[in-house]
């Protein structure tokens, strides 16, 4: 079973993604902010991380920087999911090492397809 870590502080998004990915046979882990995600990543090794940019404590950009510094986590596929839709934000996210940058609002169905494409 593939593992996915969803990192977002919006409960409705988390609930929708958790439900959908579980339905698609993923083991799902949830973090509400970057620090919680980094704590989970100490004990779990997901195949994919869906990462919001704007979060309390540690934002998504800083979280990805920490992930990429960790040899154990470098292989994880990362998708930014954010309302920040300016070119500079997208470029920054991809430059930090994200595989995709998806802008909110988004299609959950398409996101699942993108995740599946990344891990094949």
Go through the PLM ranges and name each one.
Residues 55:
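Receiver (REC) domain active-site loop signature in two-component systems and cognate sites
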Residues 106-115:
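C-terminal output helix
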Residues 30-48:
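Acidic, metal-coordinating helix/loop segments flanking the phosphotransfer/catalytic sites
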Residues 11-29:
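Two-component/phosphorelay signaling modules centered on CheY-like receiver
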């Amino acid at each position: 079973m593939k593992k996915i870590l969803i990192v977002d502080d919006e409960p409705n998004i988390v609930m929708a993604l958790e439900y959908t990915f579980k339905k698609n046979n993923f083991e799902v882990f949830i973090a509400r902010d970057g620090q919680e995600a980094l704590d989970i990543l100490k004990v779990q090794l997901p195949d994919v991380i869906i990462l919001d940019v704007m979060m309390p404590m540690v934002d998504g950009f800083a979280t990805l920087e920490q992930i990429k510094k960790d040899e154990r986590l470098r292989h994880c596929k990362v998708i930014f999911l954010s309302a920040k839709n300016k070119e500079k934000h997208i470029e920054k996210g991809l430059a930090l090492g994200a595989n995709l940058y998806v802008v909110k609002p988004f299609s959950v169905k398409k996101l699942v397809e993108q995740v599946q494409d990344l891990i094949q």
